[in-house]
Swiss-Prot record:
Region Disordered: start-end pairs: 1-29
Pfam hit, one: Na_Ca_ex
Full protein name: Vacuolar cation/proton exchanger 2
Organ and tissue specificity: Expressed in roots and shoots.
Chain segments carrying region Cation selection: 136-171, 328-363
Subcellular location: Vacuole membrane
Transmembrane segments: 66-86, 89-109, 127-147, 162-182, 195-215, 229-249, 282-302, 311-331, 353-373, 380-400, 409-429
Ranges of the Extracellular topological domain: 87-88, 148-161, 216-228, 303-310, 374-379, 430-437
The protein's role, per its UniProt record: Vacuolar cation/proton exchanger (CAX). Translocates Ca(2+) and other metal ions into vacuoles using the proton gradient formed by H(+)-ATPase and H(+)-pyrophosphatase.
Topology feature Cytoplasmic, residues: 1-65, 110-126, 183-194, 250-281, 332-352, 401-408
Similarity section: Belongs to the Ca(2+):cation antiporter (CaCA) (TC 2.A.19) family. Cation/proton exchanger (CAX) subfamily.
Bilayer topology: Multi-pass membrane protein
MF annotations from Gene Ontology: calcium:proton antiporter activity
Gene: CAX2
Length: 437
């Protein structure tokens, strides 16, 4: 037995010396470890990819919840598809198509303002100002472009005019009234210097609208029907340059002029550091989606204006000046009242008067230039009745703002002025209404 064990030991020794040992070599072990590492890394990559995909889906669902489900006003969203269905099911219900489209656009306009604010949180003040100038009145601009494409020039003029009147009288009046009721023991204060600058721009806009109207109705044109269009196009280019200069003045050159006064500065700084509820890419995607959906509904809305006027027994001027701007200004209306109740009148003025300035100095001239490109005779001749209404409104609001204070009585006066304007357009017969049929 001992001899056999020795023989086996000698054989194992010979195998090891001859290189035929079945034990693993160092190279083979390293290869196995490398393969194991690659498998481990591959499994980690797969897990990471799976987690990333799941995270993207969760992020998308969160974005939908924040933008669509979180706002209570979005209960009105189904009215949009109902308007589209009703348009194709029956041609005899244009009044309902108009009303449903009007209601359906309201939450979209509010959410468009929200997406713009979220995107502005990721940009600097200059780009943020340009975003507000572009998307702040995007609803009015889209409706106007659709009407302009269909040759409904008076609808374009009246809807933009109505948006200015609504912001200056109804939105600002409700904000002053609500703020005064919440703070009844004292007058609320705001930055008078910025209000004076905006009032000057609004008076410049009135100047640009007044001369084509006066030129037309005094029959003092060099070429009847052509000179006012040429003057309007030239004035529109000048107004666009003036608005661009205003943006530079506000955002770069004289930023201190627009800083809040008193104790509002610290509060506004805290509010400006609000949470970024959606990412920059999501904000851009939502801007695109909401703009497309507003564009679709705007087409049905514009097509139904004439039929709605006949079925509802309302003048087209009243629909264009009063009803359409209320939808476009839904976001401004809510935010202006909210900031006034929080005693932040500078933000309220930036929303209400700033929006009026954007429309008068940017949107209206922009529509004239676009109409020029389209071959439409869009001009700044808003007729004497509309131009006089705008002129008186600007004067009233300028007097209200000259002291730099507000209270509930000033707000009440502005609201009552708007009711008078609304009643005036309800009984007003547009001399050019036949052009829009």
């Amino acid at each position: 037995m001992m001899g056999a064990e020795k023989a086996e030991g000698m054989e194992e020794l010979e195998l090891e010396e001859g290189g035929g040992s079945p034990s693993p070599s160092p190279m083979t072990a390293a290869g196995k470890m490398q393969a194991l590492d690659f498998e481990h890394i591959g499994s980690l990559a797969a897990v990471a990819e799976s987690l990333s995909t799941g995270s993207k889906w969760r992020r998308a669902l969160t974005s939908v919840r924040v933008v669509i489900l979180q706002a209570k006003i979005n209960v009105l969203l189904p009215f949009g598809p109902l308007a589209v269905m009703l348009h194709y099911l029956s041609a005899n219900h244009q009044g309902w198509v108009f009303l449903f489209s009007l209601i359906g656009i309201t939450p979209l306009a509010e959410r468009l303002g929200y997406a713009t604010e979220q995107l502005a949180l990721y940009t600097g003040p200059t780009i943020g100002g340009l975003l507000n100038a572009t998307f702040g009145n995007a609803t009015e601009m889209i409706i106007s472009l659709y009407a302009l494409k269909n040759g409904m020039i008076r609808v374009v003029q009246q809807s933009l005019l109505g948006s200015i009147l609504s912001n200056m009288l109804l939105v600002l009046g409700c904000a002053f009234f609500a703020g005064g009721l919440v703070h009844p023991s004292r007058d609320q204060v705001f930055n008078k210097a910025s209000a004076v600058v905006n009032s000057g721009l609004l008076l410049m806009a009135v100047l640009g609208l007044m001369f084509p109207a006066v030129l037309h109705f005094t029959h003092s044109e060099v070429q009847y029907g052509k000179s006012e269009v040429s003057l309007s196009r030239f004035s529109s280019c000048i107004m666009l340059v003036a608005y661009a200069s205003y943006l530079f003045f506000q955002l770069k050159s004289q930023r201190s002029l627009y800083s809040p006064i008193g104790e509002q500065e610290e509060e506004v700084t805290e509010d400006e550091e609000e949470e970024k509820e959606i990412t920059q890419g999501e904000a851009i995607c939502w801007l695109f989606v909401l703009t497309i959906w507003i564009s679709i509904l705007s087409g049905y809305l514009v097509d139904a204006i004439q039929g709605a006027s006949e079925s509802l027994n309302m003048p087209v001027a009243f629909i264009s000046v009063i009803l359409l701007p209320i939808v476009g200004n839904a976001a401004e209306h809510a935010s202006a009242i909210m900031f006034a109740m929080k005693d932040k009148l500078d933000i309220t003025l930036g929303v209400a008067i700033g929006s009026s300035t954007q429309i008068s100095m940017f949107v209206i001239p922009f529509c004239v230039v676009i109409g020029w490109i389209m071959g439409q005779q869009m001009d700044l001749n808003f007729q004497l009745f509309e131009t006089a209404t705008l002129f008186i409104t600007v004067l009233v609001v300028a007097f209200m703002l000259q002291e730099g204070t507000s209270n509930y009585f000033k707000g009440l006066m502005l609201i009552l002025c708007y009711l008078i304007v609304a009643a005036s357009f309800f009984v007003h017969v547009d001399p050019d209404s036949s052009n829009n049929k």
